[in-house]
């Protein structure tokens, strides 16, 4: 599946000044097989954007276009516009939500008051999977998200915050979406929990899922994603290579995007193939990255 957002505008309160838009003419594309980071401070528009991609919200202006292949391998296109233009197509919202999954930051609100197994089975059955097959799927998926079989018989109230997020991911996976958005999946987790969560997302990406990770934590995403969409005040102010953004010192400082752990950040860059020397400050690190990017550009 491919998603195209075209000049999306969202205003929650029409009485507010016109410049106070939750989303302001947002245009971008999400292609099949990408692993993207959506970065921005709290209130920048990340979550509102995600809700539009999943048709939980409909735009006040602009449109969202979905391109996908149906069960007969025929290419389909669905365009979501302002509600009054979209009423005749509301029946297709379920098709969008089947193909575009979302795991929100407060995952407990996506879980039912029943066993984890029943929760996962419900997602599979809702998509037409026979119940006996759905039970097998639940057993496979629970291990995919890093939990053992014993968790299937537990209730959400017995789980930690990180475990609830993993179970929420399992419930979405049971519906087998093409694209999965994760809204602040590492928020509130300790370093070990953060690493495990990112490893799960990377595993899903390698299995062919399109993964979009929304976060305000730059350190969490640099090792895992190559494309970054940066939101500020409801607008996209950067959409491109994750590491190229580091070449602009002024941009990083103005948007409070500096990495918090210089040593850890340097090690991540080396791991993905950037030969960074023993820099002593963020400014030196940015300067060296700038030279490397320029060298690669000249080589191309």
Curated annotation (Swiss-Prot):
* Naturally occurring in which organism (per UniProt): Mesomycoplasma hyopneumoniae (strain 7448)
- Keyword Acyltransferase tagged: no
Membrane topology per the entry is: Peripheral membrane protein
Q: At the top level of its lineage, which domain of life is listed?
A: Bacteria
What protein is this chain from? Energy-coupling factor transporter ATP-binding protein EcfA2
Q: What is the lineage of its organism?
A: Bacteria, Bacillati, Mycoplasmatota, Mycoplasmoidales, Metamycoplasmataceae
Q: Which PANTHER family match?
A: ENERGY-COUPLING FACTOR TRANSPORTER ATP-BINDING PROTEIN ECFA2, HEAVY METAL TRANSPORTER
Task: Name a GO molecular-function annotation.
Answer: ATP binding
Keyword Membrane belongs to the record: yes
Q: Which positions bind ATP?
A: 40-47
Residues covered by the ABC transporter domain: 3-258
Q: What does this protein do?
A: ATP-binding (A) component of a common energy-coupling factor (ECF) ABC-transporter complex. Unlike classic ABC transporters this ECF transporter provides the energy necessary to transport a number of different substrates.
Q: Which UniProt keywords apply?
A: ATP-binding, Cell membrane, Membrane, Nucleotide-binding, Translocase, Transport
User: How the protein assembles, per its UniProt entry?
Assistant: Forms a stable energy-coupling factor (ECF) transporter complex composed of 2 membrane-embedded substrate-binding proteins (S component), 2 ATP-binding proteins (A component) and 2 transmembrane proteins (T component).
Task: Report the sequence similarity comment from the record.
Answer: Belongs to the ABC transporter superfamily. Energy-coupling factor EcfA family.
């Amino acid at each position: 599946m491919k998603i195209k957002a075209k000049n999306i505008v969202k205003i929650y309160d029409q009485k507010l000044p016109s410049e106070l838009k939750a989303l302001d003419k947002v245009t971008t594309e999400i292609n099949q097989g990408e692993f993207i980071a959506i970065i921005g401070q709290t209130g920048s528009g990340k979550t509102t954007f995600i809700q539009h991609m999943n048709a939980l919200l409909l735009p006040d202006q602009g449109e969202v276009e979905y391109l996908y292949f149906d069960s007969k391998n025929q290419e389909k296109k669905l365009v979501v516009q302002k509600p009054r233009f979209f009423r005749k197509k509301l029946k297709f919202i379920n098709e969008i939500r089947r193909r575009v999954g979302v795991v929100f930051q407060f995952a407990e609100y996506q879980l039912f008051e029943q066993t984890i197994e029943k929760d996962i089975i419900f997602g599979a059955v809702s998509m037409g999977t026979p119940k006996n097959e759905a039970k097998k799927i639940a057993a496979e998926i629970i291990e995919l998200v890093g939990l053992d079989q014993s968790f299937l018989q537990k209730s959400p109230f017995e789980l930690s915050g990180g475990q609830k997020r993993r179970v929420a991911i399992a419930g979405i996976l049971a519906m087998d979406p093409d694209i999965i958005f994760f809204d602040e999946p590492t928020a509130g987790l300790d370093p070990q929990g953060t690493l495990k969560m990112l490893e799960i997302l990377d595993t899903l990406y390698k299995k062919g899922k399109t993964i979009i990770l929304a976060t305000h934590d730059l350190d969490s995403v640099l090792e895992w994603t190559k494309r970054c969409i940066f939101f500020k005040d409801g607008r996209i102010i950067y959409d491109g290579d994750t590491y190229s953004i580091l070449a602009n010192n002024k941009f990083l400082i103005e948007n409070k995007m500096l990495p918090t752990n210089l040593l850890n950040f340097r090690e991540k860059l080396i791991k993905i193939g950037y030969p960074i020397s023993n820099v002593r400050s963020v400014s030196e690190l940015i300067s060296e990255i700038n030279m490397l990017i320029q060298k690669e550009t000249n080589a191309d």
